[in-house]
Amino acid sequence: MQKQNWLITGVSTGLGRAFAEAALTAGHTVVGTVRSEEDLRAFEELRPGNAHGRLLDVTDDDAVPGVVAEVEQSVGPLDVVVANAGYGLEGTFEETPLAEVRRQFEVNVFGAVATLRAALPHMRRRRRGHLMAVTSMGGLMAVPGMSAYCGSKFALEGILEALGKEVAQFGIHVTAIEPGSFAPTGPDGP
């Protein structure tokens, strides 16, 4: 396999960290986004020279395009972008405050959209690339007590399906990653 440049959001723990470790092990260069200096240093220590950390809050609409453009300049053309940053919100529909529902969509939907949109023009110009986003089995079937989370993942599924049809003509692939349950890493898991 040819060495590729990857950008993965949310690599501090969990799936993002696992994706990054797998790509690094395969010999790829990975730029991983985190929200703290401590997590940035820990990520870069995984594979010095191939693991590059960037501070980014995916809900900062102004910051996302700048980070993607900077990575394209400093690391090289991005071959794969994985919009992974997200979280699960538990709570019944009736009892979950609207502000928490909005935040769930800001991170899980609009953060992913901002990330993929920022990378798309670069890939379209090169007529190649792979855009991925982590949805969930919760984006395919509803789970009681997680209406906001499932709603955000259903929304992302629809966006990705349409996006795939829009960009296929440019040689760009789109993948929805739909994991089921997994054991978290970091402070909340093994």
How would you label these PLM feature ranges?
Residues E94, M141-S147:
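Active-site loop immediately N-terminal to the catalytic Tyr-X3-Lys motif
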Residues L56-G66, L98:
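The beta1-alpha1 cofactor-binding region of Rossmann-like NAD(H)/NADP(H)-dependent oxidoreductases
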Residues S136:
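Residue(s) in the substrate-gating loop at a strand-loop-helix junction
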Residues S12-T13:
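Conserved glycine-rich cofactor-binding loop
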Residues A168-P190:
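SDR active-site lid
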Residues T92-F93, E100-R102:
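Substrate-binding pocket helix/loop in short-chain dehydrogenase/reductase
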Residues L116, S152:
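Active-site helix of classical SDR
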